[in-house]
Amino acid sequence: MRQSGRKSNQLRPISLELSPLINAEGSCLIKIGNTHVMCSASYDTTVPPFLRNQNRGWITAEYSMLPGSTSQRNKREAVQGKQSGRTQEIQRLIGRTMRSIIDLQKLGERQITIDCDVINADGGTRTAAITGSYVALHLAIRSLMKKRILKVNPLINQVAAVSCGIYKDQPILDLDYLEDSDAEVDSNFVFAGNGNLIEIQGTAEKKPFSEEQFLEMLKLAKAGVAELFKLQNQVLLNL
């Protein structure tokens, strides 16, 4: 039993609030336990220079943590004049994940920007951002099709992500901050809706982990994202 009372294979309580932002084409406030992330998807007709006149679209992402999202105030990176390596890593992860589930040719010469702003951080912010961003992107595509900006749906898959780790020698699902801070192994799994993997991030924080432990984490992650996919589908089908 974990400090939170959860079982090793148990996700934190999850909610997905659709369209909390009125100006973005699509938005979602995802809450996983005490980790809350506002995700939005905005449409633009300007694509990166390398894609001009190629009738091919692009999806990019930006990620940030609000100053009050952590126990000690987190300084705004804009004030410091540069993004941290962590921020750049996470927004690249979100961007390439979203591009992997879109037919960029069908998107046409358009760009969708995914914005992920962490309101409250208690572990798993990047995986929450990915899971919420899919919902925001889905809503944005639906809006663009309704406006007849898009004639064909470019979405080709679903995506969700979850963290796993080795904590006190036990593989566990969906680490909170206290677990993440003291874990022997920290990993993130990004899955497509068809069961294929999009990305795996895994680090031995204290000691190397075995293939058997990795496979146990993979099994936990597959079961966890199955629950996330089910929740995504429930909220989107009820529109």
UniProtKB/Swiss-Prot annotation:
Give the top-level enzyme category: transferase
Annotated positions binding phosphate:
R86, G124, T125, R126
E.C. numbers: 2.7.7.56
The answer to whether keyword Translocase applies is: no
Alphabetized, the UniProt keywords read: Nucleotidyltransferase, RNA-binding, rRNA processing, Transferase, tRNA processing, tRNA-binding
Catalysed reaction(s)? tRNA(n+1) + phosphate = tRNA(n) + a ribonucleoside 5'-diphosphate
CDD domains the record matches = RNase_PH_bact (cd11362)
**Which SUPFAM superfamilies does the record match to this protein?**
Ribonuclease PH domain 2-like (SSF55666), Ribosomal protein S5 domain 2-like (SSF54211)
One Pfam family for this entry, by name? RNase_PH_C
According to its UniProt entry, the protein's GO biological process terms are: rRNA catabolic process; rRNA processing; tRNA processing
What GO terms are given for molecular function? Answer: 3'-5'-RNA exonuclease activity; tRNA binding; tRNA nucleotidyltransferase activity
Q: Does the keyword tRNA-binding apply?
A: yes
Concerning its family, UniProt says: Belongs to the RNase PH family.
Q: How does it assemble?
A: Homohexameric ring arranged as a trimer of dimers.
This chain's function reads: Phosphorolytic 3'-5' exoribonuclease that plays an important role in tRNA 3'-end maturation. Removes nucleotide residues following the 3'-CCA terminus of tRNAs; can also add nucleotides to the ends of RNA molecules by using nucleoside diphosphates as substrates, but this may not be physiologically important. Probably plays a role in initiation of 16S rRNA degradation (leading to ribosome degradation) during starvation.
Q: Kindly provide the name given to this protein in its UniProt entry.
A: Ribonuclease PH
Supply the source organism for this entry.
Rickettsia bellii (strain RML369-C)
Origin organism lineage: Bacteria, Pseudomonadati, Pseudomonadota, Alphaproteobacteria, Rickettsiales
Q: What gene makes this protein?
A: rph
